[in-house]
């Protein structure tokens, strides 16, 4: 079947005819999935086969066989990693509390919520976890995040499930109502005495079920279960979040970053391999001798042949084949890869003279990459919001005496219903720090922005505490400046103040001393 058959439709005969190598490889991959992953569901078989195909290309296995000896330009991996790292930057993301009804959030409320999220995501290794989330989603098009309560360390662990082992069922086919979620862990048969191949965990809103199995069937009602355990779901919801890599309004599952470039990358590699074969053939030239015997002639550097017949002719086969059309076609394929992936050539290291390039021109050049990053910020951001909400809901069940949680709910009893904790992605686009600070200063002077908004834009973490620290520093600097000014004033103007005090202590002569006679008061004048 062709790649266009992965959505559940019949593969195209024309596609198989044009790409027989890809068809053979896909057939072998499909057989592997059928034997080891899915045995009883054709549609899921197509989905999982697609996931495995994307992963093989990401890992550089672009051929059915002999991948080590064949030339392979792994643009699938380069493009996926570039978009992901462009979104994450150095710090991945920070947290920001947003109210559904208002933009005004108490500083103390935001501080408590951010501290809770920083703790649980930090314990889950946020930076590496963030990369794995975008990696799994970028390759397969879908990523499932699970939230587990770790009793020993009192935190909610966020983890990434392998999309190739995740299976979802819905209520009456409604994608908005997940009925159950099942994740499987492949096992090595040699490592266990019972011959188990899979460990399975299945969640519903009411219960959690775990078991081992020896076959690859996914229908839990018909499969033989070993060491089966079942217990009540303490949360009342399935602690798993599904994130689409790219929006797909036609169904539940998302779109992979490799969806549009995989076939082109495959053809490009095959073409470059053929060009390499032509060049390799002419690197060690073949010597042609006519009209003479080659038995006594030694080929090599510094060898001199003499005594050849006059009609003899000796020459090397040269590269006289015109490869310009092939080279131009390879360039067209390379250009198409960049156009369809929205990753400019400059983003992968192509040298560009940017000394006289304006910031606006650079933004236009990198706009496709920024557009892809913005789409992922939307889809993954909404998924992380759901994960943050689950963390708080699990805390209410597993650790209701949590100090910060109690303070948060005391200040905002309806916090979970009226607020969301959003991620603010760092974005790795090169920035002119001086220009950014000048623009921030101008916005503050014009009173069209706040310090908090500017800090969020710059990717600062723990903004409420940072603002308090800045204000405290400003107050301390003001008090220190006041004390310094007072000390300088006393040092420079202390003598003048002393003279004024002495003048004040000198008795003022009355009019009798000045005129030589006493001025009568009102009573004497009346007399």
Name every feature range the model reports, one short phrase each.
Residues 303-310, 321-325, 329-527:
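C-terminal helix-loop subdomains that flank or include functional centers
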Residues 131-250:
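Extended, regular secondary-structure scaffolds
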Residues 108-113, 121-129, 260, 264-267, ...:
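Short amphipathic alpha-helical segments
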Residues 220-364:
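Extended, charged amphipathic alpha-helical segments
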Residues 1-161, 165-166, 176, 522-525:
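Extended, helix-rich architectural segments
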Residues 131-135, 148-150, 280-290, 347-353, ...:
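Short coil/turn segments at secondary-structure boundaries
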Residues 96, 100, 104, 312-317, ...:
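Short glycine/proline-rich turn/loop motifs
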């Amino acid at each position: 079947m062709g790649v266009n058959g992965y959505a559940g439709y019949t593969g195209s005969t024309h596609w198989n005819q044009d790409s027989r190598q890809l068809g053979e490889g896909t057939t072998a991959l499909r057989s592997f999935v059928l034997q080891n992953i899915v045995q009883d569901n054709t549609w899921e078989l197509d989905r999982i086969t697609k996931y495995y195909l994307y992963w093989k290309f990401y890992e550089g296995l672009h051929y059915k066989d002999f991948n080590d000896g064949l030339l392979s330009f792994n643009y699938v991996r380069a493009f996926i990693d570039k978009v992901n790292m462009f979104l994450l930057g150095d710090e991945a993301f920070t947290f920001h509390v947003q109210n559904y009804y208002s933009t005004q959030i108490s500083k103390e409320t935001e501080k408590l919520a951010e501290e809770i999220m920083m703790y649980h995501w930090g314990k889950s290794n946020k930076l590496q976890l963030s990369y794995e989330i975008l990696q799994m989603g970028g390759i397969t098009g879908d990523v499932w995040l699970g939230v587990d309560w770790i009793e020993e360390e009192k935190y909610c662990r966020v983890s990434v499930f392998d999309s190739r082992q995740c299976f979802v069922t819905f209520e009456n086919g409604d994608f908005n109502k997940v009925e159950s979620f099942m994740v499987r862990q492949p096992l090595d048969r040699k490592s266990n005495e019972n011959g188990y191949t899979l460990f399975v965990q299945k969640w519903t809103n009411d219960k959690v079920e775990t078991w081992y199995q020896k076959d690859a069937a996914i229908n839990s009602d018909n499969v033989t279960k070993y060491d089966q355990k079942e217990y009540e779901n303490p949360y009342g919801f399935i602690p798993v979040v599904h994130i689409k890599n790219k929006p797909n309004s036609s169904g539940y599952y998302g779109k992979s970053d490799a969806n549009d470039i995989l076939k082109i990358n495959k053809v490009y590699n095959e073409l470059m391999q053929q060009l390499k074969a032509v060049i390799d053939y002419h690197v060690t030239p073949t010597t042609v001798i006519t009209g003479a015997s080659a038995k006594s002639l030694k080929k090599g550097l510094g060898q001199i042949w003499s005594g050849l017949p006059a009609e003899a002719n000796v020459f090397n086969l040269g590269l006289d084949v015109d490869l310009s059309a092939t080279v131009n076609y390879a360039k067209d394929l390379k250009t198409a890869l960049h156009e369809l992936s929205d990753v400019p050539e400059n983003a992968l290291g192509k040298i560009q003279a940017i000394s006289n390039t304006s910031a606006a021109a650079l933004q236009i050049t990198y706009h496709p990459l920024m557009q892809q990053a913005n789409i992922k910020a939307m889809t993954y951001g909404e998924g992380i919001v759901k994960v943050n909400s689950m963390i708080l809901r699990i805390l209410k069940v597993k650790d209701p005496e949590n100090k910060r949680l109690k303070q948060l709910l005391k200040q905002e009893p309806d916090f979970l219903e009226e607020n969301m904790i959003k991620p603010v992605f760092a974005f790795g686009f090169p920035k002119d720090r001086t220009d950014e600070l000048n623009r921030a200063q101008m916005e503050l002077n014009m009173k069209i922005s706040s310090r908090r908004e500017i800090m969020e834009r710059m990717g600062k973490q723990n903004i409420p505490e940072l603002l308090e620290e800045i204000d405290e520093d400003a107050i301390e600097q003001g008090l220190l400046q006041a004390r310094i000014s007072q000390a300088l004033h006393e040092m420079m103007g202390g003598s003048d103040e002393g003279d004024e005090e002495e003048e004040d202590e000198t008795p003022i002569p009355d009019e009798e001393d000045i005129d030589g006679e006493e001025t009568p008061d009102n009573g004497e004048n009346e007399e």
